[in-house]
């Protein structure tokens, strides 16, 4: 049986496109993550009185709220130029849907493109310092092989990522109240490179980025983020959705026995 590393290497050397490998065995657990995010929408009742529509009020409230998060469901999607998650630039990140419990527990379903022509899905689980990745052929979980930077806990870091990102925003403008999975405050500002690297799990590096945020008017929680990145003229577009704050997910290590 090929290891997860050798299976990915074999897929990189595969020619031809259009094939999506099915998830099997333990990875099917993570496939359930995807169906819930689509059902997460807004509602007309905000649950309280909205805060003042002023960046001077919204930003401190959002920074405090995001720094206090204990669990969240996320969906991060990339369009445009590919962004790679392996050291040989063969495994391009397309999308991740997952759940995070702070501290140190997360699971995610990753859509990736191998060698530019083969679409597949990988399950990733992180639990108290250990990370496992699903074998793309068997679907069974195995310890994360060397050379792959896929730790799903990095997709959401409240204290080390989100709070300082919001506190460090520059040139912030308030763009109005919009319907974005419910009524949300829309702000735009420039995020510093160091903090953006943290909140994108190191997928975006070495550049300050203009970011659009949608913030819940009562809780201050960020529910959507959009931005573009430019790597020597190759532009990637990013969309992040956040939902189910405070839910209990009961994330556990994968069953390595299948």
Residue ranges: model-predicted function:
Residues 28, 32-33:
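Hydrophobic helical h-region of N-terminal Sec-dependent signal peptides
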Residues 41-258:
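Subset-of-secretome marker
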Residues 4-27:
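Bacterial N-terminal signal peptides that target proteins for export
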Residues 36-39:
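C-terminal motif of bacterial Sec signal peptides marking the signal peptidase cleavage site
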């Amino acid at each position: 049986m090929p290891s997860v590393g050798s299976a990915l290497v074999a897929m990189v050397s595969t020619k031809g496109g259009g094939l999506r490998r099915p998830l099997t065995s333990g990875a099917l657990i993570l496939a359930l993550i995807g169906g819930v995010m689509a059902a997460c929408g807004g509602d007309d009742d905000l649950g309280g009185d909205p805060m003042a529509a002023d960046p001077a009020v919204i930003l401190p409230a959002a920074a405090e709220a995001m720094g206090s998060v204990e669990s969240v469901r996320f969906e991060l999607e990339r369009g445009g130029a590919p962004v790679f998650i392996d050291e040989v630039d063969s495994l391009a990140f397309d999308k991740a849907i997952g759940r995070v419990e702070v501290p140190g527990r997360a699971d995610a379903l990753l859509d990736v493109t191998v060698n530019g022509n083969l679409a597949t899905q990988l399950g990733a689980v992180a639990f108290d310092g250990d990370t496992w990745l699903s074998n793309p052929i068997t679907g069974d979980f195995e310890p994360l092989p060397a050379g792959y930077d896929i730790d799903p806990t990095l997709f959401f870091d409240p204290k080390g990522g989100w709070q300082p990102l919001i506190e460090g925003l520059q040139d912030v403008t308030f763009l109005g109240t919009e319907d974005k999975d419910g009524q949300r405050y829309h702000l735009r500002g420039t995020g510093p490179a160091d903090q953006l690297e943290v909140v994108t799990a190191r997928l975006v590096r070495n550049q300050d980025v203009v970011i659009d945020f949608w913030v819940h008017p009562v809780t201050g929680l960020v529910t959507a983020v959009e931005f573009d990145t430019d790597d020597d003229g190759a532009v990637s577009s990013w969309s992040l959705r956040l939902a189910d704050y405070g839910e209990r997910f009961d994330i556990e290590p994968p069953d390595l026995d299948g």
